[in-house]
Amino acid sequence: MNQYMKKKLVQHTAIATAIMMASSMLVISTAYAHEGRLYSIGDKDYWITVGSINEPVFVDDKSGAEAFISLADPSDPFNSDANGTKNIEGLEKTIKFEISAGDKKKELIVEPAWRDPGHYEATFYPTIETTYNYRLFGTINNVSVSLDYQCVPGGAQEGAQENVTKQISEGVTIKAQRGGFGCPASRADAGFPEPYVSNNELVSMIKELQKGQNSTK
């Protein structure tokens, strides 16, 4: 191999290594921005990790609730990255998301993510800055489930894994949990070159303007 080829090989190797490191950092960041829990559902253990699509999320962004669901490694169930962990496909037929904010609720159909087994998405656009609750419900392993996840105001949480044992419902027990995901934030400080005004704020402005016009008639 001549010197030119050796130089090119070294360059390509360095680039490939950088890409792998960047990908690893992205995976770690995604994991931290979601809340992972280990559940015993029926006779099997599952890791169910829930968060918002495209975090960090701002008001009026295209986002949504997403879940990563895998069968835990029987030999090392408390380790979500164990070699025997298996992503579960086909659950879009048996589960849904219910999103809620204040007294408003809405059911969303779950779709499998493109070419990412075990990853399920339900798209929506958060219209105000508030605390959102994602309820994953339906059946898993022929057992009825209703699992509540709530965003954290002020940003995502990392933290160490906490191993707990608590029955949630018949046939469903939580065994471990870690992390958290942030609530949608205001775009007021992120807008450029002009301050961003949300759709909800625009509607409020229009209503106030109409109210003022009606009062002068």
Where are the language model's segments positioned?
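N-terminal soluble domains immediately following signal/targeting peptides that reside
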Residues: 30-216
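C-terminal segment of classical bacterial N-terminal signal peptides
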Residues: 21-30
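Bacterial N-terminal signal peptides that target proteins for export
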Residues: 2-17
